[in-house]
Amino acid sequence: MTNSIEVINLSKSYKSKQAVNNITFKINKNEIVGLLGPNGCGKTTTIGMMLGLLKPTSGRVLINGMDIEKNKISLLHKMNFISPYIELPKKLTVRQNLIVYGKLYNVNNLNEQIDYLSNKLRLKELLDKVTGELSSGQKNRVSLAKALINDPTVLLLDEPTASLDPETGDFVRTFLENYKKEKKISVLLASHNMDEIKRLCGSVLMMKDGAIIDSGTPSHLITKHGRKNLEEVFLELVRSKNEFN
């Protein structure tokens, strides 16, 4: 199976702070891998380096075998990401938002892509509304459409369902499940949501203090640690003071 994403001995330091410490993992084509860890453990920094937005102190990120630092422009055209911390331009309509982002990525079949995503994400009736008037759930679906406008082969998700109501969160998770199967993309999902991780991810990376402290399928991790569920495994690992330090 092709390794669409390969992170090799990746580290990031800020003066005396080690934000990410020598992490290594792979994500195959048609696979969603979960990145689970407490606030401040290095998840967002890791995603920033994978996107080429942050320069690693050491290590490499390979996308389809190519180094992101050396091939940033060409690789970013086939990558995208979602974060709840990035706001949409409030005065643009949904359609205008998608057109702007589509042109940034030089999408050739832009109108067809907008039609496809607006149908899949239930945005058809919202295309001519300004985003400043949308609910948080509607904005989330627009952000998802924006992240998929360039038909990426690699998708990085940072808390994609944060602050969503249960119904909208379930819709987004179902969409991601189906989209991954249809497009055979590689996905890294950073989340605090255990149900989301268990439902979407074939394997999980447990992160603490900038390091990957354990990894495996949810069932493997539960069995290995003799716990009832993934949440208990997670709490055991992040509360450990000495075992992994």
Question: What name fits each language-model region?
Answer:
Residues I99, K103-L126:
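Conserved ABC ATPase "signature" region
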Residues V130-L134:
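Conserved ABC ATPase signature
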Residues D151:
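Conserved catalytic motifs of ABC-family nucleotide-binding domains
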Residues L155-D158:
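Catalytic Walker B motif of ABC-type/P-loop ATPase nucleotide-binding domains
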Residues D170-E182:
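Helical segment within the ABC ATPase nucleotide-binding domain
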Residues S215-G216:
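ABC ATPase "signature
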